């Protein structure tokens, strides 16, 4: 079993299944109940509703566990059936193929809890919690250290995996530890050093582990009004420099030091360039937006076109920050 990173009662499988309605008669749709949990695996579940691009086909199998036990059961099911596993958080850094994804997609959006330790200044957060919502909650408590994250459009799990960052700060700066599950359901706790953090990446990317929660070191005891005001400044900066009026995945490419990917794309004359419903944003060239009716393959072809144009002009091959899942067809 391979796991892709865009988590009671341990159950045993076999699981029972029943037939359900399927809009695609060429593919059988079913629900698989995992014994010992309130969890069910659905087949042929459309993923477009769960990605920020609002594109993508169906997952061969899809599950959204509500607790660690159900997540462990889902992983065991995948292991016993030799299924590839893809972990889905907010879907904000993903491009899912129009053809969908094979294997089991595990959505962590229902794994939600937050625990503040007011003595140590540490906060432990479940993988499915929203980063922007947390930034506001933490600011209102008067805790510093998370203000920069208010504009990160994702969940804690995804942010830990990709070392999300903004405003010269990143997850690695404040992470104490991350709790992860291995394919057999074993719980591990890893430090930032063990995660091998680098710019917008970690050893979790492409690994066989799923993040369930993370603990961060913050600084309590500040004026909530001051921290909230700083958080608002970070949010306003992103609103004025990044497109929020159309669906996107956030930044498409990593910045190739010492350059900005957006600057290279803009200087290549690509602002506003469009393929199908996918367009290079006018406000920020490192964003591709869905202007309406875009297909995942439109976005994929636009990514490839940008890479070709920038490499031809600057001899720099831009590396995608967005993770592409499934099969795509180049134009």
UniProtKB/Swiss-Prot annotation:
Its cofactor is FAD. GO terms for biological process: cell division; cell wall organization; peptidoglycan biosynthetic process; regulation of cell shape. It is an enzyme of class 1 (oxidoreductase). GO terms for molecular function: FAD binding; UDP-N-acetylmuramate dehydrogenase activity. It is found in: Cytoplasm. Its EC number is 1.3.1.98. Keywords: Cell cycle, Cell division, Cell shape, Cell wall biogenesis/degradation, Cytoplasm, FAD, Flavoprotein, NADP, Oxidoreductase, Peptidoglycan synthesis. InterPro entries: FAD-bd_PCMH (IPR016166), FAD-bd_PCMH-like_sf (IPR036318), FAD-bd_PCMH_sub1 (IPR016167), FAD-bd_PCMH_sub2 (IPR016169), MurB (IPR003170), MurB_C (IPR011601), MurB_C_sf (IPR036635), Oxid_FAD_bind_N (IPR006094). Pfam families: FAD_binding_4, MurB_C. PROSITE patterns: FAD_PCMH. Belongs to the MurB family. PANTHER family: UDP-N-ACETYLENOLPYRUVOYLGLUCOSAMINE REDUCTASE. This is UDP-N-acetylenolpyruvoylglucosamine reductase. The gene is murB.
